[in-house]
Design a protein with these regions (language model features):
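Membrane-helix boundary/coupling elements in multi-pass transport proteins
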Residues: 83-84, 106-121, 225-238, 296-333, ...
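Extracellular loop-to-transmembrane helix junctions
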Residues: 19-20, 43-138, 148, 254-257, ...
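Membrane-interface loop-to-helix entry segments
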Residues: 123, 136-195, 226, 249-253, ...
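C-terminal membrane-solvent junction of multi-pass transporters and transport-like membrane proteins
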Residues: 163-164, 334-345, 384-438, 467-469
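Helix-loop-helix connectors at the membrane interface of multi-pass transporters/channels
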Residues: 4-15, 89-92, 119-139, 171-174, ...
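Helix-loop-helix junctions that connect adjacent transmembrane segments
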Residues: 14-19, 56-57, 131-134, 166-301
Length: 470
């Protein structure tokens, strides 16, 4: 399957046959960083802080620790065979065509759902400046812009993600520095609250809402990490994957500590966790609370671009998944055709049309944070399925192809053990989703997707698999 589409370094091959390796190491590193700083951090951290208090810091650290090993497994598998275009390919190769089909389509749906959440978030951020702006205007404008830019070249996507990620990095580093200065100067807000690290343990301790509050923070916190595997969909368009992928994956722990742990510590030191409003972004509210509305507008711009960045990643990855699925014969053939600029234009257009579902969600659930929570729960469950498939593929790889593991230049540490630990953790998170009413509703809806996929496989997949065996 993986050799049906050749991947070339430049413009030598016909556009309709080949993806091009036009993403440089600079692009890959920033795509990896941008993928790790998702909308869930900016939009969802208000609710997670409200649910868990300071213990949310440990929630992010635990999830980040687990996902680092998932990414190490993905990295070793992708580098074991450079013909793999994405994790959908190695799933199909190692687990069977059904796995490639389920993984590819689920990952496509993951990013469509995530894109809907981003559309919802963008609407909320736009209303910070324009309270009377219609929901669909901001959403439609962003979707059209992303489609236009992605239709250009893959390098344009890389450049967009580079600058989107740079904006996020500068903003978070600035927030951390400003917050530390406020704490050092014992800054007092207009409400009389003095900035202090003591807020982390003085107001009920590290676990003010007990274990139930701690566990409740996992759902949106998991969603904050979706996109961390995005570098796995760029493998076919990366100039030097042997160097770029390990470097991007190895930097994950540092990114998590810097962007998640430090920023949350600063937020809860300047604004006591009990004062954080769950319906609003604490990144924006921090500056509003200390009387800096201009800075709040800047941060609002940053979180808006963050949501746009996440949607941009989704548009890119969904179109590449549709391209791969079409090449395998389990998606419409039209998605297998590339434009003159070597981008899957029809897949891009189709995915962007699907993103408009985010506007529909706002009408079904008028509460922005309510719509966001429902969408992100579905997304988190589906992403955990994809991450589990990556781990299962790794276990089969270790059993069936030990020689490839032995000569691998990028071995996963504690490989087999951590695969089982991570999968047990994902089961634990799914169980937690049954405890809250809003997440339980989404959990009950999610199986419908797998039922639909199963029916599709009965009619399409088996026929295609038989053809491949011939």
């Amino acid at each position: 399957m993986v050799d049906q589409v050749k991947v070339v370094a430049d413009d030598q091959a016909p556009a309709e046959q080949s993806l091009r390796r036009n993403l440089t190491n600079r692009h890959i590193q920033l795509i990896a960083i941008g993928g790790a700083i998702g909308t869930g951090l900016f939009m969802g951290s208000g609710k997670t802080i409200n649910l868990a208090g300071p213990s949310i810091i440990f929630v992010y650290m635990i999830i980040g620790f687990m996902l680092f090993f998932v990414m190490r497994a993905m990295g070793e598998l992708l580098l074991s065979n450079l013909e793999y275009k994405s994790f959908s390919d190695f799933a199909s190769d190692l687990l069977g065509p059904w796995a490639g089909y389920f993984t590819g389509w689920t990952y496509w749906f993951c990013w469509v759902v995530t894109g809907m959440a981003d559309v919802v978030a963008i609407t909320a951020y736009a209303q910070f400046w324009f309270p009377d702006l219609s929901d669909w205007v901001a959403s439609l404008a962003v979707i059209v812009l992303l489609l236009t830019l992605n239709l250009a070249t893959v390098k344009m996507f890389g450049e967009m993600e580079f600058w989107f990620a740079m904006i996020k990095i500068v903003a978070i580093v600035s927030l951390i520095v400003v917050g530390l200065v406020m704490v050092a100067m014992h800054f007092q807000s207009p409400t009389g609250v003095e900035a202090s690290f003591a807020h982390l343990w003085n107001d009920g301790g590290w676990f003010p809402k007990g274990l139930s509050g701690f566990f409740a923070g996992f759902q949106i916190a998991v969603f904050a990490f979706v996109g961390i595997e995005l570098v796995g969909t760029t493998a076919a368009e990366t100039k030097d994957p042997e160097k770029s992928l390990p470097r991007a994956i190895n930097s994950i722990p540092i990114r998590i500590i810097m962007f998640y742990v430090f920023s949350l510590i600063v937020i809860m030191s300047v604004t006591p966790w009990s004062s954080v409003v769950p319906e609003k972004s604490p990144f924006v509210e921090l500056f509003v609370l200390v009387g800096l509305p201009a800075a709040a507008s800047v941060i609002n711009f940053v979180v808006l671009t963050s949501a746009a960045s996440s949607a941009n990643s989704g548009v890119f990855s969904t179109s590449r998944m549709l391209f791969g699925l079409a090449q395998e014969g389990v998606a419409p053939k039209a998605f297998a055709k590339l434009s003159k600029r070597a981008v899957p234009a029809k897949g891009l257009t189709f995915s962007c049309i699907c993103l408009l579902g985010g506007v529909v969600m706002l009408y079904v659930n008028p509460s922005v944070i309510g719509a966001f929570t429902m969408i992100t729960t579905v997304s988190a469950i589906l992403f955990m399925f994809v991450w589990t498939i990556i781990l299962c593929s790794y276990l089969v790889y270790r059993k069936q192809r030990p020689h490839l593991h032995e000569k691998s230049i990028y071995k996963m540490p504690l490989g087999k053990l951590m695969c089982w630990v991570c999968m047990a953790f994902f089961v634990f998170v799914v169980v937690l989703l049954t405890l809250e009413d809003d997440t339980r509703q989404a959990l009950l809806v999610t199986p419908l997707w797998f039922i639909a996929l199963g029916l599709g496989w009965l009619f399409i997949g088996k026929k295609r698999a038989a053809e491949l065996r011939k």
